[in-house]
Amino acid sequence: MQQGNTATLILLRHGESDWNARNLFTGWVDVGLTDKGRAEAVRSGELLAEHNLLPDVLYTSLLRRAITTAHLALDTADWLWIPVRRSWRLNERHYGALQGLDKAVTKARYGEERFMAWRRSYDTPPPPIEKGSEFSQDADPRYTDIGGGPLTECLADVVTRFLPYFTDVIVPDLRTGRTVLIVAHGNSLRALVKHLDEMSDDEVVGLNVPTGIPLRYDLDADLRPVVPGGTYLDPEAAAAVISQARP
């Protein structure tokens, strides 16, 4: 934590997953990391150590790509011993019936307008997934307490489920001056960045969060960013990834 700041928050999107590499809609499907994704996770740990940015507490989703990324990063930084808290509220956005589908094939089938509305709009969810289908989570024991979880979500739904957890559980850690690391997913982190930077619904549509590059937010006494948008620990790599993001 820099002098004069109340708290430091580090956001990290998991390393490249198997389905990121295959350009498939993933959502709540529990896929692993590619070799590249594991290397990204290791590099993120090196960046944390190089910047002497070692967290006091870790938050992750319930999905292995985030959990594995966090483990590799903290193992690399020799910082595995910190408390860990996990919640489904940090999970990726649920992509409904699109989960498991190839993005390019889906775009060709339904047209760019509908595809982009499902994928990038703030408040248009894809069609719901059918319970009991191959890529549904209704029988997953992780989600028994919430009835198997959602059947589809838009980004607005992710904001609705994540922000109360952030406010009620994570903010108290920040207010005590702890450095908090959140390892999560593209859309759950977009939801949080929208809140932190007070972005409009339209602005967040164009926001991309690269895999495996820590994003640092130093927060003031009101938990507002000292630097709007935060600071990537490898800004050149982040800019390169964002510029090449697939629509």
Curated annotation (Swiss-Prot):
Keywords (A to Z) from UniProt: Gluconeogenesis, Glycolysis, Isomerase
Xref: PROSITE patterns: PG_MUTASE
Enzyme class: isomerase
Binding residue positions for substrate: 13-20, 26-27, 65, 92-95, 103, 119-120, 186-187
Entry GO MF terms: phosphoglycerate mutase activity
Annotated SMART domains: PGAM
Catalytic activity: (2R)-2-phosphoglycerate = (2R)-3-phosphoglycerate
Protein's name in the database: 2,3-bisphosphoglycerate-dependent phosphoglycerate mutase
